[in-house]
């Protein structure tokens, strides 16, 4: 009986907390811009993730309409080695250069850089998968910053 009461009370509190998904259709309407054209150069994996996140803004044309040219690079840097010369710590650094055009005229240009440090793994397959996941997460962070910057361009 106590479990049912606890579950019921928990359900009431959680349902009224006001949670909304960040990229819901309702929240994308808060940003009064659209993207008419996207072009990408550079790291394919990062570009695909950015394109996936920006697709919400290409659906309908609004008053403020941007054309984006995105150039991305990603590099893996060795931070530390052990006595045998094997790498023990790495850092993935992702840099995205964005040219924002409005009506065929350069409106803004900015660079967003993110990095993440991690330790080596003896299982190379798991290490590769972990690196891919890190790159995807960095691309998500960069995309969130990009959307915020686009919303603030006057």
What annotation goes with each model-predicted range?
Residues 1-17:
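Sec-dependent bacterial lipoprotein signal peptides
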Residues 14-34:
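Bacterial Sec signal peptide processing site at the extreme N-terminus
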Residues 20-27, 112-120:
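Mobile beta-alpha loop/short-helix "lid" or hinge segments that flank ligand
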Residues 37-40, 125-137:
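Second-shell loop/turn segments in exported
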Residues 39-67:
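Post-signal-peptide N-terminal segment of Sec-exported extracytoplasmic proteins
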Residues 51, 61-62, 66-109, 115-132, ...:
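Surface-exposed short loop/turn segments
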Residues 130-152:
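C-terminal partner/receptor-binding element of secreted or periplasmic proteins
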């Amino acid at each position: 009986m106590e479990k049912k009461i606890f579950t019921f009370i928990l359900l009431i509190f959680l349902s009224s907390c006001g949670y909304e998904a960040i990229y819901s259709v309702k929240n994308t309407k808060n940003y009064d811009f659209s993207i008419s054209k996207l072009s990408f150069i550079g790291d394919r994996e990062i570009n695909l993730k950015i394109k996936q996140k920006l697709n919400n803004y290409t659906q309908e044309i609004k008053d403020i309409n941007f054309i984006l040219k995105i150039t991305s690079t990603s590099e893996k840097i060795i931070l530390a080695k052990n006595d045998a010369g094997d790498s023990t710590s790495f850092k993935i650094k992702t840099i995205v250069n964005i040219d924002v055009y409005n009506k065929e005229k350069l409106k803004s240009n900015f660079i967003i850089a993110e990095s993440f440090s991690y330790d080596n793994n003896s299982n190379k397959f798991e290490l590769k998968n972990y690196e891919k996941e890190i790159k995807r997460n960095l691309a998500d962070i960069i995309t969130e910053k990009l959307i915020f910057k686009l919303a603030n361009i006057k």
